[in-house]
Every structure is written in C-alpha cells, then in structure tokens.
C-alpha cells in the first residue's frame, strides 16, 4: 500500500532524526572541547549512533562545522525578519538596539559554539551561503534606513546600510572570537556606534 503523499517515509524520518542528533551532539562537543578536542568518536557517542552512521552523513569535522553554520543561518534569517517587522513602528533610537539585540542574542544563546563557527567557517569555504544571507540582511537594512530618511542624516542610505551591516557583523564576530559576547556593554556600545554614524 502506498503511503499518503504528505507522509514522510519512515526511513527519511529516521535519517532526519539521526542528522539532527549528530548535529546537536557535535554542537555540544564543540562547546565543551573546541574544534581540536572534538573527535568524531566523541560526537557519535554523544549522539547515540555508530561512527559509521555519522560518516554516512558527514565525512569529516569540517562538514559538521559547515552544517552547524548552515543551521545558524537558517535560524538567523527568520529571527531577523521578525525583528525588522517588530521595528516598523519604532523610532530610529528604539529600533537600532532592537535589531542589533536580535543578532547579538542569537550568538549569545550558544557563545562557545559560535566562537568555533566564527573561527573555522572562513577556512571551510562557507562563503557563498554567507553572502546570500548577508544580501538579504543588507536589503532589509537599506529599506529600514530609507523608511527613516527624516531621522537618518547619512546622504547615501545604500552605502550606510553596507557599512552598518559589515561593522556590526565584524564586531560581533570579534566578540565571539574573544569570548566577550556576554559582556553587558556589547549591545549598548554597538547601538551607540551605529546611531552616531547614522545621525552624522
């Protein structure tokens, strides 16, 4: 008997569950041990699968790191889309910390993991997907600034959007690498910097 078209194949369900378990185990082991200390044996053991099962989906640690980074990007896009929607009725002064707080909050949720991702992904050629997500974010920031032309004094909103996205991203990544994501001053300082730049 053929299963209903909307029902997932049990084999696919098991495969998805295995991949999810391995990714979460990899995240936990990377958080605890860092990239050098994380072994595929430890990850497989934490996930409750054999090393052979792990290698079916991920040939090495690099592929695991890239998959975790992809998961981060998948969380980033809808989270930031929601933040921009919430910011529509806010003033520039209120909207900027709300938006930056959304980004920083994602990194703060798992700081040790994001430290590994920030350090390792550039060496693993994860740039194409990063550029795609950054392009979407840049378009949102550009529209955000254009909608607040009366509050933004920068003469070139397109350039300003690029500078803001690049600066906030670079400083957040630096905080991740240096273990400073949880510092209370991070969000206020980023907010102060961006507002000063946009107001000229």
Annotate each PLM feature:
Residues 106, 143-148, 165-183, 195-200:
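Amphipathic C-terminal alpha-helical segment
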Residues 36-37, 152-155:
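Short, charged helix-capping/linker segments at alpha-helix termini
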Residues 17, 21, 29-63:
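Helix-turn-helix
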Residues 1-17:
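N-terminal intrinsically disordered/low-complexity leader segments
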Residues 80-88, 114-121, 148, 175-179:
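Secondary-structure edge/capping motif, primarily at the C-terminal ends of alpha-helices
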Residues 74-78, 94-109, 125-150, 158-162, ...:
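Amphipathic alpha-helical packing segments from all-alpha helical-bundle domains
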Residues 15-26, 43, 68-80:
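Generic hydrophobic, amphipathic alpha-helix propensity
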Residues 104-125, 142, 170-177:
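Amphipathic alpha-helical segments used for helix-helix packing
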């Amino acid at each position: 008997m053929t299963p209903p078209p909307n029902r997932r194949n049990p084999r696919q369900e098991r495969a998805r569950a295995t991949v999810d378990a391995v990714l979460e185990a990899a995240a936990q082991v990377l958080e605890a041990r860092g990239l050098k200390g994380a072994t595929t044996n430890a990850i497989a053991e934490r996930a409750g699968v054999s090393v052979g099962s792990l290698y079916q989906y991920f040939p090495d640690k690099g592929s695991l790191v890239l998959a975790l980074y992809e998961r981060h990007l998948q969380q980033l896009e809808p989270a930031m889309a929601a933040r921009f929607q919430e910011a529509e009725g806010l003033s520039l002064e209120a909207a900027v910390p709300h938006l930056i707080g959304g980004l920083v909050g994602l990194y703060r949720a798992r700081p040790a993991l994001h430290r590994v991702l920030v350090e390792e992904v550039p060496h693993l050629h994860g740039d194409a997907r990063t550029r795609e997500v950054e392009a979407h974010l840049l378009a949102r920031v550009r529209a955000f600034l254009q909608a607040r032309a009366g509050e933004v004094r920068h003469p070139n909103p397109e350039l300003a959007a690029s500078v803001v996205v690049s600066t906030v991203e670079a400083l957040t990544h630096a905080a991740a690498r240096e273990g400073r994501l949880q510092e209370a001053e991070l969000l206020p300082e980023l907010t102060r910097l961006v507002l000063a730049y946009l107001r000229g």
